[in-house]
């Protein structure tokens, strides 16, 4: 995660802290500009450069370049629309890990010391942001099974078993 953020910062000219804090934040003004086809579209078409794009688009494009560079070698990329960015590659294992809300709250309470209410609020906000980010940049639905090769319920399997299953699937896919 940190390495990808730092590489994207170098690529975009933005600070690592800015990217880390804003990579999944899609503002309503960005969504409005996206719908209206305002100035950033000129940058996407190569007519105005990336500086005419909203910062969120600059961050996404910088991360996209870094993800594509990393994917030239064996690697693990968590999130960041990597399944979409690498959709043309055939040697990619696309995994979605999920758990019930009850299991996720339990984990957040245990790992971060949150109250159950705070855990629910943080998870709901995070899920909403991820879904909005994913839909904005991919036009796909976050968590849609059609976008993944493997989906695992870490709540019922446990984190270690899910990790072992992913490793096994990746090894089998290499054969």
PLM features per residue range, with description:
Residues 1-5:
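A short beta-strand-loop structural module common to alpha/beta enzyme folds
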Residues 170-175:
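A common structural junction motif
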